[in-house]
Design a protein with these regions (language model features):
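Short beta-strand/loop motif that positions the catalytic acidic residue
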Residues: 256, 262-264
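Alpha/beta-hydrolase active-site loop
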Residues: 135-161, 165, 194-210, 223
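Short glycine-enriched nucleophile-adjacent loop
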Residues: 151-154, 177-189
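Catalytic active-site module of serine/aspartate enzymes centered on a nucleophile-bearing elbow/loop
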Residues: 305-353
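Short substrate-entry loop that stabilizes the transition state in hydrolases
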Residues: 71-86, 91-131, 269-272
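Conserved alpha/beta-hydrolase "acid-adjacent" motif
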Residues: 248, 269-276
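Domain-level recognition of soluble alpha/beta enzyme cores
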Residues: 25-91, 113
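Short beta-strand immediately N-terminal to the catalytic nucleophile in serine-hydrolase-like folds
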Residues: 170-172
Length: 353
């Protein structure tokens, strides 16, 4: 019987891989990318939104997400969009080295190949020359960036006629995962946010930066932090290692009405406390939860270039940015994550196609 079960498991894995290839062929091998502005009254700026989409031949070849540490992913700048109408995934990035939309090109590009349009705003303050701990910790502003991105996509002449506006979901990784939960209806507890960096127990890397930047979370104006950021246009959210989950009002999870898929990277007991989502999965009425045991929180980064770990040490990057589990390469973990995301969004927002 055990041998029979193994055979069935192997056949199922082969069938699933075949299905993913078939789904990809139903999309487009060409992926276009373009920038659009998303005006934000609250931020007082136009958000820079990167959009990946199924494309026809054309455009200029570009590589997005490449850095001294990470490999990039190719796409075609301003290529013509493919015929048809497509579901929309609003993508929220994390902070730090992966604190920009292009850092997630490794997942956005294959999603476009599978027939999704993926739009990701650059959340202000999270990376680059304008990196700011104070702006990064205004977590309650991030869901508004996602809503403004959706508003901009609805008005954009290039995209507006080719999107299925009743088929919109949000995908978030790390801090983007907590953003996805907030746009689904989870509310921040201002006191928990103020207390978040009182110790290093929850997020030593982030909180060290906050303190070194001279930011006192207790002194921040948190009067709007607990507001309702739910956007009812969103049909489904998926959060991968959402962080920080410790700043939410736990009771608000029970009021989330849309389906939610939560994924943690790592084995139970080794998942960062601030990203551990098993308890909130039980609190959300329509949630699923899974783990990828041989991954780590850093598996959400693009594939590391040769020598990246040594460069990180030289640059005094303390996080093990190139460390995954011990049994698989990051590329294999990425393939599994991409397949999980494609399956989830195909089920929840692309079901009519």
């Amino acid at each position: 019987m055990k041998r029979l079960n193994k055979i069935w498991t192997m056949l199922w894995s082969i069938a699933l891989s075949t299905l993913m290839v078939q789904q990809a062929s139903g999309g487009s091998e060409n992926v276009g990318v373009r920038q659009i502005p998303a005006p934000s009254k609250e931020r007082g700026i136009d958000l820079d939104v990167t959009v990946w989409y199924p494309a026809r031949s054309g455009g200029k070849s570009v590589t997005l997400g490449e850095s001294v540490f990470f490999a990039g992913t190719p796409s075609m700048r301003d290529a013509p969009i493919s015929d048809g109408k497509f579901p929309l995934i609003l993508l929220s990035h994390g902070a730090g080295l992966a604190g920009n939309p292009q850092a997630l090109s490794w997942i956005a590009t294959p999603l476009a190949k599978h027939g999704f349009v993926v739009a990701a705003p650059a959340h202000p303050g999270n990376t680059g020359t304008n990196r700011s701990a104070a702006e990064t910790m205004k977590l309650w502003l991030r869901p508004g960036d996602i809503s403004e991105t959706l508003n901009a996509m609805e008005k954009d002449a290039f995209f507006k006629e080719q999107l299925e506006y009743d088929e919109v979901g949000t995908l978030g990784l790390s801090m983007g995962g907590s953003t996805a939960l907030a746009i689904a209806g989870a509310r921040i507890d201002p006191k928990r946010l103020a207390d978040y960096c009182d110790t290093d127990a929850l997020n030593p890397s982030l909180c060290e930066w906050v303190r070194q930047s001279g930011v006192d979370l207790h002194a921040m104006d948190l009067r709007s932090a607990g507001r309702d950021n739910e956007d009812r246009r969103i049909r489904f959210v998926m959060a991968i290692d959402p962080a920080p989950v410790d700043v939410f009002d736990f009771n608000s999870f029970s009021k989330i009405s849309v389906p939610v898929e939560l994924v943690n990277l790592g084995q139970p007991g080794k998942i960062p406390l601030t990203a551990e989502a098993s308890k909130i999965a039980k609190a959300i009425p329509n949630a699923t939860y899974s783990t990828i045991g041989d991954a780590s929180h850093y598996s959400m980064f693009a594939e590391c270039k040769p020598g990246a770990s040594e460069i990180a040490e030289t640059e005094k990057v303390r996080d093990p940015i190139c460390m995954d589990g011990v049994s698989r390469a990051r590329s294999e973990i990425h393939t599994q994550l991409i397949n999980m995301v494609v399956a989830a969004f195909s089920r929840e927002v692309k079901s009519s196609h």
